């Protein structure tokens, strides 16, 4: 076991490890061979096999091309590190609101403290973004660092968007009707049936007449880099190329 793995497991309660082991068996290791293959992970995450392979390669300590349970823990460790605030930080925010220290937050305490907490949240988010994205260590984030950092987080954002906002019947794909409903709700009268069909055919890589999440993800990521650059320029008020 690697030092990194030993340290990670040592800091986890046994109940948590047991729960993650059950999650691994029930939802990841679908053929019950004790490992997760690229195909299994791609199916579970509804993503291209290339993306699944990239994830496995990042934690494949024994280089067998599959994800063992200990490697799965490393994968989950990466997700844990992506959380914006730790449990200790959240507890501190609660304590800051709980002025009389009785373990509960009253409406008056919430009203008085929310402005202060909101300021801390915004400052904390900004500081964490700078720390994570500032690859050259100059204390600022340039456009390349900004784009690289946010693009790395896009798949999870797009997955949430796809399933919650687009795929209304929950079948894992977008039909012509779902696309039409979505576009006409947000941009009424701007998209004809013919144009929607053309949009689907451009994204529909497997030719089944529907948009799967993997197809949606590949297309959305291509579009999003320009959007992220535009956001960077909007934030960069003094136009010096850094935030």
UniProtKB/Swiss-Prot annotation:
Family annotation (PROSITE patterns): EF_HAND_1, EF_HAND_2
UniProt: Ca(2+) 5 binding residues: 167, 169, 171, 173, 178
Binding site for Ca(2+) 1: 29, 31, 33, 35, 40
GO molecular function: calcium ion binding
Positions bound to Ca(2+) 3: 98, 100, 102, 104, 109
Top-level taxonomic group: Eukaryota
Binding, Ca(2+) 4: 134, 136, 138, 140, 145
Binding residues for Ca(2+) 2: 60, 62, 64, 66, 71
SUPFAM superfamilies: EF-hand
Domain EF-hand intervals: 15-49, 47-82, 85-120, 121-156, 157-189, 191-226, 227-243
Keywords: Calcium, Metal-binding, Repeat
Distribution of this protein across tissues and organs: Aboral ectoderm, a squamous epithelium covering the surface of the late stage embryo and larva.
UniProt-annotated binding residues for Ca(2+) 6: 204, 206, 208, 210, 215
InterPro entries assigned: EF-hand-dom_pair (IPR011992), EF_Hand_1_Ca_BS (IPR018247), EF_hand_dom (IPR002048)
Keyword presence, Metal-binding: yes
Record's function text: Calcium-binding protein involved in larval development and metamorphosis. Likely to function as calcium buffers mediating the transport of calcium from the sea water to the blastocoel where calcium is required for skeleton formation.
Protein name per Swiss-Prot or TrEMBL: Calcium-binding protein LPS1-beta
């Amino acid at each position: 076991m690697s030092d990194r793995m030993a340290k990670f497991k040592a800091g986890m309660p046994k109940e948590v490890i047991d729960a993650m082991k059950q999650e691994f068996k029930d939802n990841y290791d679908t053929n019950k061979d004790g490992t997760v293959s690229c195909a299994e992970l791609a199916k579970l995450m509804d993503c291209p096999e290339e993306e699944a392979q990239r994830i496995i390669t990042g934690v494949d300590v024994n280089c067998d091309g599959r994800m063992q349970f200990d490697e799965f823990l490393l994968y989950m460790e990466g997700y844990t590190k992506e959380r914006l605030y730790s449990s200790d930080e959240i507890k501190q925010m609660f304590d800051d609101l709980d002025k009389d220290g009785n373990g509960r937050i009253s409406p008056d305490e919430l009203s008085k403290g929310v402005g202060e907490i909101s300021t801390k949240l915004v400052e904390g988010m900004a500081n964490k973004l700078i720390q994570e994205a500032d690859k050259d260590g100059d204390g600022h984030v340039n456009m390349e660092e900004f784009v690289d950092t946010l693009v790395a987080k896009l798949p999870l954002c797009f997955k949430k968007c796809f399933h919650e906002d687009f795929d209304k019947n929950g079948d894992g794909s977008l039909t012509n009707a779902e696309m039409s409903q979505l576009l006409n709700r947000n941009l009424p009268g701007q998209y004809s049936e013919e144009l929607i069909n053309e949009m689907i055919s451009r994204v529909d890589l497997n030719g089944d007449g529907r948009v799967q999440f993997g197809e949606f993800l590949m297309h959305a990521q291509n579009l999003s880099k320009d959007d992220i650059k535009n956001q960077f320029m909007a934030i960069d008020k003094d136009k010096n190329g850094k935030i």
